[in-house]
Amino acid sequence: MRILVTGGAGYIGSHTARLFAEYGHEAVVYDNLSRGHRWAVRWGPLVVGDLADGELLRKTLRERRIEAVVHFAAVALVAESMKAPELYFRNNTMGSLTLLESMRAEGVETIVFSSTCATYGHPVRLPLDEDHPQAPVSPYG
């Protein structure tokens, strides 16, 4: 299977790409390298691009014949999100929307989205589960 790993030059994304390669899949990494590292991409091709670039996303999905997407690309620091909420909205929210629109345009129907416990905010009860209320307390969440 050919899988696009957004944010694949980061810690979690690069390890995921390695596992895909070990299991015989082709992991195509899509990363803008703003926080990831070129040296971390060792188990498949790297496409340097931003989530905001719908044209490059569509071209990558089409030309690489991508069958599924694992989406890790995000800026992910709570304190920074409080100081620069527009960066988090632009990259995490609008970038994800551009990715989804590009997938739809190219007929790619499968996505795994890596989220965060920051979406829950302050816990109402413990342990947290998927039915817990979503009440983020930061732009990142």
Task: For each feature predicted by the language model, list its residue ranges.
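N-terminal Rossmann-like NAD(P)+-binding domain of SDR-like oxidoreductases, especially those catalyzing
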Residues: 1-141
